[in-house]
Amino acid sequence: GKVCRLKKSIYGLKQAPRAWNARLMKDLKSIGYIPFMHAESIFWRYKDDIKVYLLVYVDDFLLITSAKSPKIISNLKDEIASFYTIKDLGQAEYFLGINLEHSAHSIKLSQSAYIHKILDRFNMAECKAVVSPMLSHDNLFDKRLATEKEKLLMLNVPYREAIGALMFLSVRTRPDIAVAVGTLAMHVQQPLPKHWEAVKRVLRYLRGSVDEGLVLCKVPTSEFNLRIYADADWATNSEDRLSRSGSVSQIGDSTIWWKSRKQTSIAASSCEAEYMALFESAKDAIWLRNLPCEFGFCPRPAPTTIFQDNQGSLLWPKQ
């Protein structure tokens, strides 16, 4: 047999994303853009003494600038258009499935249109809403093999599709469903009927909170400080007894980062589980303190406060 050597990368190849990123980096650097050290998909440069940011997600670009002159903004777009054919959508109101609602002192990020879409997709548009995404007494950790009857019941159920759709929400604008979705995602290989009922409960919860989202408010320089709230359960998972860490990070009153994740080793006590959550939050704090500095908004030099409710884990480092 023979092997053909391609003269250029084409869409669909394994190396196509890497080749596109290398080309994009080269082109943007040639017109003065510099990638962030802590987030290489964000670029910055100066244009007529005005700082400009460019957020890149594959081939979707979000241009951020304080420039008021339409001419400057047009010139910035024309520079990018000199390399690629672009579609200018004007002021950002929708980006990567997220609605952006601008007001004088804040921006609200929500996904109401996407929620309506998935409710229709899974025939839950007219369902009865509930006030919580998950019930604590439901044994959703059960990983037993499905019976033949249960396999038949789940044969054509779009469980994997539903989990994927919900994960898209939970990592972007809906931290309130992160625990429920993370728990249900453990069963995509062989879900049981009760897991599908739990998925539908998450959808019913979304039905009653369609317009909820994140509100990012202006923060005075004197209040620009990072706070992190960390917590953990202890051995809640009856199958492997791994605990779950959770954290929410805020600047001012705005939530900018969150995490809900199973721990990788078994904690011998609630103190150990909480201490692991503290450790993960401390690692997040390093990155979260550095990233705003690249935007020119460094948190105050005071140490980042991580809030915890377990006295043992707070006293442990002092011993």
Protein language model regions, located:
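Long, low-complexity, charge-biased intrinsically disordered regions
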Residues: G1-Q319
